[in-house]
Amino acid sequence: MAQWEMLQNLDSPFQDQLHQLYSESLLPVDVRQYLAVWIEDQNWQEAALGNDDSKANMLFFHFLDQLNYDCGRCGQDPECLLLQHNLRKFYRDIQAIPQGPTRLAEMIFNLLLEEKRILIQAQRAQLEQQEPALEAPGENQQHEIESRILELRAMMEKLVKSISQLKDQQDIFCFRYKIKASAKTHSLDPHRTRQEQVLQETLNELDKRRKEVLDASKALLGRLTTLIELLLPKLEEWKVQQQKACIGAPMDGELEQLEKWFTAEAKLLFHLRQLLKELKGLSSVVKYDEDLLFKGVDLLKAQVTELLQRLLHRAFIVETQPCMPQTPHRPLILKTGSKFTVRTRLLVRLQEGNESLTAEVSIDRNPPKSQGFRKFNILTSNRKTLTPEKGQSQGLIWDFGYLTLMEQRSGGAGKGNNKGPLGVTEELHIISFTVKYTYQGLKQELTTDTLPVVIISNMNQLSIAWASILWFNLLSSDPQNQQFFSSPPKAPWNLLGPALSWQFSSHVGQGLNSDQLGMLRDKLFGQNSSTEGLSLSWVDFIKRESPPGKLPFWTWLDKILDLVHDHLKDLWKDGHIMGFVSRSEERRLLKKTISGTFLLRFSETLEGGITCSWVEHQDDDKVLIYSLQPFTKEVLQSLPLTKIISQYQLLTEENIPENPLRFLYPRIPRDEAFGCYNQEKANLQERKKYLKHKLIVVSNRQVDELQQPPELKLEPDLESLELDLGLAPGPEPGVGLDLEPLLEAGLDLGPELEPMLQSTLEPVLEPILDEVLQGVPEPNLGPELKLEPILEPVSQPVPEPDLPHDLRHLNTDEMQIFRNSMRIEEIMPNGDPLLASQNTNVDEACVFHRSHFYTDGPLIPSDY
């Protein structure tokens, strides 16, 4: 579809722009419409911006022929009388205009450009209406920058043409001046008088063209200045985004687009600088009084140089902030003696063909004058050279991939240390880069700085160091403020909340929802706190112990973050972990669901722990909430949480195991939620010689060990109980092994004993209370907690056939006095002694319980 035809279909606001355009133009709109196809088929850009006037003259005569031809056609149709009149009128008017061919070419070229701009605006507005979500906030500004660059290029081409015409005009003047000067005629000679008159007219025309070129140069410089004022804020927006991206925020800015714009701006400025040099040379050849070009060129050149310096200094940036390879999710934290990477970039992609550019790195060029501020040296090479070949193919990028820091020794001996008012993790350091840039005779020393980094000496400091990086980049308005932690500001919750969510979205792929953020807010400020005006101090963020676990808030949250990343990432991303929910909210949610509904939440009393809570409705309408002892990473390294949930067993009164976890909150069947995580690939080539085994978690109901302080009363219809858990492996359950202490101690059972691993900790039902009073007599629990014990009580000693005769009627009543004063491990440090009938064979060291025996498949006889 022709451009004019598309313009006729626009909405009224854009039609008004089109009418306004042609109301200010010499070309009538009916002439544009009648000759639309012919006009759009011609190369008006070459005719208007080219150095050869013959192309403009040729198009001019073709245009007149086309008008004359169409006037003849219209004369045959009486209904086209008005159109015929307008065509003839424009035919006469255009021939009367001075420099008609050039004026016509420039006019139509500019009209076509404006038409295209209106058409693009209309198309963009239509897309915004159809897909408003796809429109970026800065989309309009981006299109404005693109259109301005196109306009500036057109102005530059026009200025080049004007300067070329000025050269021709000056050559004509010089030639005529030499002819006049060499002529030896009388002053009253009419021919001499005519020569002087022509020479004066030539000088007047030269002066006119000089003024036009000077005005065009000023206009171009003004437009270039405006473009810089648009580009620099876009670069600052990118830097702010980069600073927030370092602490987990999403990064939207495209650096390649900025590089394209900055390079285009620099090319235009360097080109204008070269043109001004040419104009300076022209003005020095022909000098006369009141010549504005001679003085004006120097002023314009100084302004162009100032703009170039400003652009180049701002265009030298740190593209990738310092980061150690082992902690890519936590940049700006460096460890002494460990390698780190950093990348710098010059967004003005212009380099001399034979000039290599060398960047040099340093640290703390202007350190703060504070006592105890540590000083560091860069051990590896602090220089990086960029060859023209690499610069042309990859851009002006300096990659420092193997930098290492070492602390300077204080006092000439011994290891340096920090004795200042700030701790190591609050001390901020800045790495700087310098490059000597040369292009087209302009030499500049460019400098850029990284964001402040924290330098640690031990990886144990990583968590608190990251808290410092988070706090600084969230709140600091000055990215070079190394004394920020001398008086750190408070963090408003409306900034801190999203930043905490970024930690999860960037590290584990899913941020925090409003409910989870609400729980964290209540944990920090209390449940009755208003959402407006809440702010948290730096000390409270990293040091204040928050109930109920009395753990510092950041330490507690960071341990959870590590736990999710290492063991629970898929569950977290799929939304199966509610995570941040208080115990009171947990009770409120589960109370309204059916029995067997469970949820997963993070422990508030244990670092990096996750627990499972479920609800059971009793026959007497009482509601019980059970919670498993929290699982830590030590347990989850051996047994994934998905398998724990799918294979968990709770022993009933009859010692029958059953899985009470049936529905993930609100009502998702357990196997539907977790089945996809437990699919194991079968090895068909493996000979089935052994009975398969698996680890499971087992809990017992032992109400006789339940203790509840009498002064702490639970809700009348809701009891909350906490279960200690044990890990029970198949193929044969046996004596109890406490798995977590074994894992913490690093016990290696070996492949021979792995099938026999069993942990049947006698779990205890405990009320979920913040404090447990010691030495309180056992209360009357009431009918709602009178669960049947596992074993029937006995009133008389009953002979046990499996004991030796001398131990069957042993009186244990008198031994009760030793119950709280002796420890069995002090008496028998090597474990239970073997009885006479027992064997020392390892394979027979465990006596298994049949009720805990589980297997995955049929029993297949062994060949051995």
Curated annotation (Swiss-Prot):
Which Pfam families does the record associate with it? SH2, STAT2_C, STAT_alpha, STAT_bind, STAT_int, STAT_linker
Which molecular-function annotation in GO is an example for this chain? DNA-binding transcription factor activity, RNA polymerase II-specific
Return the InterPro entries for the record: p53-like_TF_DNA-bd_sf (IPR008967), SH2 (IPR000980), SH2_dom_sf (IPR036860), STAT (IPR001217), STAT2_C (IPR022756), STAT2_SH2 (IPR035854), STAT_linker (IPR048988), STAT_N_sf (IPR036535)
A cellular component annotation (GO) from this entry = nucleus
Alphabetized, the UniProt keywords read: Activator, Cytoplasm, DNA-binding, Host-virus interaction, Nucleus, Phosphoprotein, SH2 domain, Transcription, Transcription regulation
Cell compartments where the protein resides: Cytoplasm; Nucleus
Tell me its family. Answer: Belongs to the transcription factor STAT family.
Matching PANTHER family: SIGNAL TRANSDUCER AND ACTIVATOR OF TRANSCRIPTION
Return the protein name: Signal transducer and activator of transcription 2
Q: Which organism is it from?
A: Sus scrofa
This chain is encoded by the gene named STAT2
